[in-house]
């Protein structure tokens, strides 16, 4: 209860309008999704265009790592990719506007706060975007079971784009043609494939292991991460909400003082 009350105090101190409602009303406004007695209505997630992401990455002082998703339609997979990518130090995500999960409440919930920190570029055409990234000096590496080189052997130096397809369809034929190289993750068990978010996490970890992780030993801290600004102006709040108290006496709906068009629950 103390953590729940602390959350309410922080919300009120930040100018959030707090409204106590019935459980039935909370279920209605959250669309019946699983929650812990509290929901927050926020503005939609901020995104930036691809040119801004490329320009921002050019000023980082280290080789940028971007992820691109091809046909990932499950918001839980998207949220898991964002969470792993942000935690392991990726610099941004390229997300198609079509044939892709969006930056929804479900994705934000699985991302567990990471969506607020990882820049996302929404693009109309993924393959044209990959060509634009190659023109900017990036190598495009696609994850595919039929890849001609393993993850352990592939060159992961320099600016990179890692492209992941869906677990059932993989990369589209056209996307494969726009990759500089196809890489596979060797598997030993009977299970023929990995979840898309898990495969992506393994690849991002391998890039990190060969780069910023290589000089870290014992309890040495990780180097700070610098990423492109998500907007040239002040960044609005992204979809998020949380409470660690599973059963407060009265459900609460919080509404921020910004234009709100998405509803989140946790």
Give residue ranges: language-model regions.
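RNA substrate-binding interface of SAM-dependent RNA methyltransferases
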Residues: 1-13, 59-147
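Active-site/ligand-binding-proximal alpha/beta "capping" segment
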Residues: 141-190, 195
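Structured adenosyl-cofactor binding patch, chiefly the S-adenosyl-L-methionine
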Residues: 109-112, 176-226
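N-terminal positively charged helical leader segments and presequences
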Residues: 1-55, 220-266
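A short acidic, often aromatic-flanked loop/helix-cap motif at beta-alpha or helix-coil junctions
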Residues: 24-29, 46-48, 126-129, 149, ...
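Short, well-ordered secondary-structure micro-motifs
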Residues: 31, 79, 105-106, 131-133, ...
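Short, hinge-like loop/turn segments at secondary-structure boundaries
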Residues: 35-38, 109-114, 157-161
